[in-house]
Structures are given as C-alpha cells and as structure tokens.
C-alpha cells in the first residue's frame, strides 16, 4: 500500500499527505456543481427560516462580464458572484443582493428606499438592477449591510476581499 501511496504522491516523510496540486485545486474551486449545492442549501434554509433568512455567501471571483447571463436561460459554466446570484434567482424566491468593489445588484423595489445618491440600470427580464453609488466602498458596504440586517435582502453574495474582513 505504501508503494501505491508514494507513487501517487500521497505519502511523504512517513505520513499520508493529501495536498492538492494547483490545477486540481483550481478545478475544485471553480466546480460548476457547487452552484447546485448552493441553490439546495439556500432552498433548504429558506424553507426553514422564510423571511428570517440571512445567508451570506463569500467568493473570490466577480466576473462582471457574466452580467449578461442574468435574466436568460443560458447555462452557467463557471462559479463567481454573478453565476451564484443567477443560480439562486432562477430557482429560489428570495431577495438577493450582490456586492463587490465594482458591482452592486439589488432588488428594484429597494431603489425608492435608498436615500444615498445612486443611479441604476435595470436588468432585463428580472426585478433587479445594477446600482451605482458615488463614494467609496465603505459607504456601499454600510448601506447593503443595513439592508441585509433589516431583512430587505435575504441572501447577500459578496467578495471575500470586500466583506470577508468586516
């Protein structure tokens, strides 16, 4: 058995070691199958908590160029802020928010309640819009965090770099 472990680079210094190679690690991190799991978890939590749901999903990738997939039936082939948002939006009836340094997506109905100066671009075939705010990221994070804590957003998807520290 040890020879097999050594041959497969799993046995080092008399210990079994399951360190992942960079290419395998990237494949696991970007696995599209995770989208289905995220949707299942969100569905289960929403079924249990209803409007009391407060789910935070942190990820590393934004992929703003994937915004054109929102509101379509196109397949989602990578895992990032936009595809996580769209996977949940397609299958679970919850209010979702997205926040990163370069992208904020919120339900349209929140526009009238946001007092902070903003502009928005409606996303076709959805009840969501891309919001733009003047000022720094701290202002956006405070606003979206407040909406989340008040329950106006049930699921918040953000980048680790922006939300993970706060």
Feature map (PLM): residue ranges:
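A general structural signal for stabilizing positions within well-ordered secondary structure
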Residues: 147, 165-166
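Alpha-helix capping/helix-boundary segments
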Residues: 161-163
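Conserved C-terminal RecA-like helicase domain
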Residues: 1-155
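Short beta-strand and adjacent tight-turn residues that come in two discontinuous sequence segments
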Residues: 158
């Amino acid at each position: 058995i040890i020879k097999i472990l050594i041959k497969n680079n799993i046995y080092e210094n008399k210990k079994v070691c399951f360190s992942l190679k960079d290419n395998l690690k990237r494949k696991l991190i970007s696995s599209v199958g995770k989208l289905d799991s995220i949707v299942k978890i969100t569905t289960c939590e929403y079924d249990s908590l209803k409007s009391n749901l407060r789910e935070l999903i942190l990820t590393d990738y934004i992929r703003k160029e994937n915004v054109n997939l929102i509101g379509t039936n196109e397949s989602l082939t990578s895992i990032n802020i936009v595809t996580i948002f769209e996977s949940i939006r397609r299958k679970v009836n919850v209010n979702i928010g997205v926040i990163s340094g370069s992208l904020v997506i919120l339900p349209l109905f929140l526009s009238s309640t946001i007092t902070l100066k903003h502009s928005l671009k409606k996303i076709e075939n959805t009840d969501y819009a891309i919001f733009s705010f003047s000022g720094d990221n701290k202002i956006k994070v405070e606003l979206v965090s407040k909406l989340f804590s008040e329950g106006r957003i049930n699921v918040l998807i953000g980048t680790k770099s922006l939300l993970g520290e706060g």
